[in-house]
Swiss-Prot record:
GO molecular function: chromatin binding; chromatin DNA binding; cysteine-type deubiquitinase activity; histone H2A deubiquitinase activity
Modification Phosphothreonine occurs at: 491
Subunit annotation: Core component of the polycomb repressive deubiquitinase (PR-DUB) complex, at least composed of BAP1, one of ASXL1, ASXL2 or (probably) ASXL3, and one of MBD5 or MBD6. The PR-DUB core associates with a number of accessory proteins, including FOXK1, FOXK2, KDM1B, HCFC1, YY1 and OGT; KDM1B specifically associates with ASXL2 PR-DUB complexes. The BAP1 deubiquitinase activity is not required for PR-DUB assembly.
Residue stretches making up the UCH catalytic domain: 4-235
Family of this protein: Belongs to the peptidase C12 family. BAP1 subfamily.
Entry-annotated residues carrying Phosphoserine: 292, 369, 394, 519, 535, 583, 595
Gene3D superfamilies xref list: 1.20.58.860, Peptidase C12, ubiquitin carboxyl-terminal hydrolase (3.40.532.10)
GO CC annotations, alphabetized: chromosome; cytoplasm; cytosol; nucleoplasm; nucleus; PR-DUB complex
Post-translational modification note: Ubiquitinated: monoubiquitinated at multiple sites within its nuclear localization signal (NLS) BY UBE2O, leading to cytoplasmic retention. Able to mediate autodeubiquitination via intramolecular interactions to counteract cytoplasmic retention. Monoubiquitinated on at least 4 sites near or within its PY-NLS.
Identification of the protein by name: Ubiquitin carboxyl-terminal hydrolase BAP1
Protein's organism: Rattus norvegicus
Length: 727
């Protein structure tokens, strides 16, 4: 039992995999690099690594302090999980168990649950024996350790297990019953550091205690902190991101249904007018968009996309008449996947569009310089081109695989099932399962609805009434800005705008990266309604949007509720609660950290009140929003979806790297060495190598040995009187 535990490295990936091997769910370990910064999110406990020799030297200076803070009461000590470390090299497992078994919001699994129930009320020494005699813990512990080298018998006498144990040591800092405790298995009693302040978290006090300990051990030298390491036991971020994505995707569906319900309630006569055309137009649009899962009709596409062909800083010149629904399908410009569809038509002559190469050549963009792209953009050529995503084509085979995955994810993301049964006036097309917002009559109704509500919008628009058709076409020329959301090839809903509120997931490094355009759902709707480069792409306009201002801060923490009259409100308000209710949090499927996650929701609501986002004149309640406000909210939701999907992928990739590093760490290279030596022997090279190494060792060993052996006999000979007579 005393020689079966191996020494573990201080690595967050190793501790994360060790926690999983214990059977614990929803927990991971992260490394803390800065003690000055406040910890973000809930923390279960800290694991502190230090050099035991330095700690023993500094402990003599503060012996009275340790005695004063030690908890001697047996009832208090036995009520918590504090175990003496009786097995050498088991301090890593002791530190993890001291954090996990003293936390009530963690799914411990069967192994640790039995351990906690069995050792309840035991003394620290008995708990230490229970840990040392648990084969499941020892097996999981040793599975992540480096294989120990096989020492020669004469060299093993100089090494002791106690000396190896004292090299580096792990201790835990855990909050228990409102007080900060330091649990060190090599000390007789736990250390009570007292309660933390009312206006601070327990992590703030723990950071101060650790900084004082580091300064005491290093005698105030700030550049010796490399001998210490700090890790935090936190909830699994994958569970959090998956829960947020579940809520965000549900809210995206709710916002899309709100757009549909807005048409059904406010414009029922237009639904009857276009009811006969709804069954005919999808058949006409098949040649233009053969493989596109959300192809728009050719008649309405040029009406909005050709309206905006300016540089983004000038007003729209000329008229943009709204074409009828019987336009030939050869004018279709909105095709999501150019490789799967062919543009066999010629651009209409009245529009000032410069002729380009064919689509299959022009979109490939073999060797076009950035200067040529800017010139084309200034000339208005880029506005008429087929909208494709950046880096659509590449010479790398992995990019093609990512493209196919993105198309599959996009087609699956825009298909959803309606909550209620289809009404007679419903616009949803049940045959193909597409979003009814993208149907032709819905687009016409949203366009007319927007034209009626333009005077109430605070966003400056450039409106030009055409003399031919008599209906105004809206176009807002702005520069397309890159998204502050992280760029990721796996996100099928990456939006062109950022979040409406400060998301904790964004970093300056991610914000500097360019991203792909918005998702097909919002991009097609915004192109038809507001032009290809509408003002919704601007982050400042999104920030002052009414729907985003009201629902943005809670869009990722609580589900939205759509009433029958079109009122959109947070689900917690309909239940009569404040902010997001615990039932909403539990529906996200987060395990082990429900109370901590609820605390985050309260913090989001409080920060919203402090920042002045809540208007004092109007209470936070359900309201009706215009189509443009709903589209802005939809872009906000999709930006958050892209953000969380990127972060989720990062966590998944991080786990893969943890496993790869663990395999490299624990791999036994003895078989490879034996095979290599046998191959050298077969080639006749082993004998020469052995002779060379033996000769070198003899020279070094003999010279050093003679020096030590000659000194002692010389001293003894000089002390004898008969030797002096001979001289």
């Amino acid at each position: 039992m005393n020689k079966g535990w191996l020494e573990l490295e201080s690595d967050p990936g190793l501790f994360t995999l060790l926690v999983e091997d214990f059977g614990v769910k929803g927990v991971q370990v992260e490394e803390i690099y800065d003690l000055q910064s406040k910890c973000q999110g809930p923390v279960y406990g800290f694991i502190f690594l230090f050099k035991w020799i330095e700690e023993r030297r500094s402990r003599r200076k503060v012996s009275t302090l340790v005695d004063d803070t030690s908890v001697i009461d047996d009832d208090i000590v036995n009520s918590m999980f504090f175990a003496h470390q009786l097995i050498p090299n088991s301090c890593a497992t002791h530190a993890l168990l001291s954090v996990l078994l003293n936390c009530s919001n963690v799914d411990l699994g069967p192994t640790l649950s039995r351990m906690k129930d069995f050792t309840k009320g035991f003394s620290p020494e008995s708990k230490g024996y229970a840990i040392g005699n648990a084969p499941e813990l020892a097996k999981a512990h040793n599975s992540h350790a480096r294989p120990e080298p096989r020492h020669l018998p004469e060299k093993q006498n100089g090494l002791s297990a106690v000396r190896t144990m004292e090299a580096f040591h792990f201790v835990s800092y855990v909050p228990i019953t409102g007080r900060l405790f330091e649990l060190d298995g090599l000390k007789v009693y736990p250390i009570d550091h007292g309660p933390w302040g009312e206006d601070e978290e327990w992590t703030d006090k723990a950071r101060r205690v650790i900084m004082e300990r580091i300064g005491l051990a290093t005698a105030g030298e700030p550049y010796h902190d490399i001998r210490f390491n700090l890790m935090a036991v936190v909830p699994d971020r994958r569970v959090k991101y998956e829960a947020r994505l579940h809520v965000l995707k549900g809210n995206r569906q709710t916002v899309l249904e709100a757009l549909q319900q807005l048409i059904r309630v406010t414009q029922p006569e237009l639904i009857q007018t276009h009811k006969s055309q709804e069954s005919q137009l999808p058949e006409e649009s098949k040649p233009a968009s053969s493989k596109s899962p959300f192809g728009l009709e050719a008649g309405r596409t040029p009406a909005a996309s050709e309206c905006t062909h300016t540089d983004g800083a000038e007003e729209v010149a000329g008229s943009c008449p709204q074409t009828t629904t019987h336009s030939p399908p050869s004018k279709s410009k909105l095709v999501v996947k150019p490789s799967g569809s062919s543009l066999n038509g010629v651009p209409p002559t009245p529009t000032p569009i410069v002729q380009r190469l064919p689509a299959f050549l022009d979109n490939h963009n073999y060797a076009k310089s950035p200067m040529q792209e800017e010139e084309d953009l200034a000339a208005g050529v880029g506005r008429s081109r087929v909208p494709v995503r950046p880096q659509q084509y590449s010479d790398d085979e992995e990019d093609y695989e990512d493209e196919e995955e993105d198309v599959q994810n996009t087609s699956s993301a825009i298909r959803y099932k309606r909550k209620g049964t289809g009404k007679p006036g419903s616009l949803s097309n049940s045959s193909d399962g597409q979003l009814s917002v993208l149907q032709p009559n819905t687009i016409n109704v949203l366009t007319e609805k927007l034209q009626e509500s333009q005077k109430d919008l605070s966003i400056p628009l450039s409106i030009k009434t055409s003399s031919g058709a008599g209906s105004p076409a809206v176009a807002v020329p702005t520069h397309s800005q890159p998204s502050p959301t992280p760029s990721n090839e796996s996100t099928d809903t990456a939006s062109e705008i950022g979040s409406a509120f400060n998301s904790p997931l964004r970093s300056p490094i991610r914000s500097a990266n360019p991203t792909r355009p918005s998702s097909p759902v919002t991009s097609h709707i915004s192109k038809v309604l507001f032009g290809e480069d509408d003002s919704l792409l601007r982050v400042d306009c999104i920030r002052y949007n009414r729907a985003v201002r009201d629902l943005g801060p809670v869009i990722s923490t609580g589900l939205l509720h759509l009433a029958e009259d079109g009122v959109l409100s947070p689900l917690a308000l309909t239940e009569g609660g404040k902010g997001s209710s615990p039932s909403t949090r539990s529906s996200q499927g987060s395990q082990g950290s429900s109370s901590l996650e609820e605390k985050e929701v309260v913090e989001v609501t409080d920060s919203r009140d402090k920042s002045g986002l809540n208007r004092s004149s109007e209470p936070l309640s359900g309201e009706k929003y215009s189509p443009k406000e709903l589209l802005a909210l939809l872009k906000c939701v999709e930006a958050e979806i892209a953000n969380y999907e990127a972060c989720l992928k990062e966590e998944v990739e991080k786990r893969k790297k943890f496993k790869i590093d663990d395999q490299r760490r624990t791999h036994n290279y003895d078989e490879f060495i034996c095979t290599f030596i046998s191959m050298l022997a077969q080639e006749g090279m082993l004998a020469n190598l052995v002779e060379q190494n033996i000769s070198v060792r003899r020279r070094q060993g003999v010279s050093i040995g003679r020096l030590h052996k000659q000194r002692k006999p010389d001293r003894r000979k000089r002390s004898r009187p008969y030797k002096a007579k001979r001289q």
